Amino acid sequence: NIAATAQIEADTVQTDHSVEFLTDGDNGTYWLASEDSASAVITLRFPELKNISAVVLGEYLPLGQHIEQGEILAGKNKIADFTVVGHKRICMFDPVQTEELIIKITSSRTEAALRLLEVYQES
């Protein structure tokens, strides 16, 4: 899992639920989008090119299962779509070299709450 090596930011966040909680390995902490947000964008910037082949997402289920749809981009190129995240959604795709990985939540019943974001590279 190389997500923790990236600089990470989100276009929406609630106080006390930082985007850094996505990669801290603690199932009790979580990133939470701003109230009434039906979409969100999380951007990871790596210090060098990475050969990425999988992304794992996990919702913070005590708040409910809200994420319905999203996509993953390497820079500006879409590399995967995903639907309901729930406890864990594993998104595998052909390896792609990038310094920037973007997770777009395009549809959520209410504000998204993610406890987990993992990124794996092809060895």
Residue ranges with predicted function:
Residues 1-52, 60-66, 111, 118-123:
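Disordered, acidic Ser/Thr/Pro-rich linker "stalks" and the adjacent N-terminal cap
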Residues 35-39, 50, 61-123:
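Trp- and acidic/polar-enriched beta-sheet ligand-binding modules for extracellular glycan
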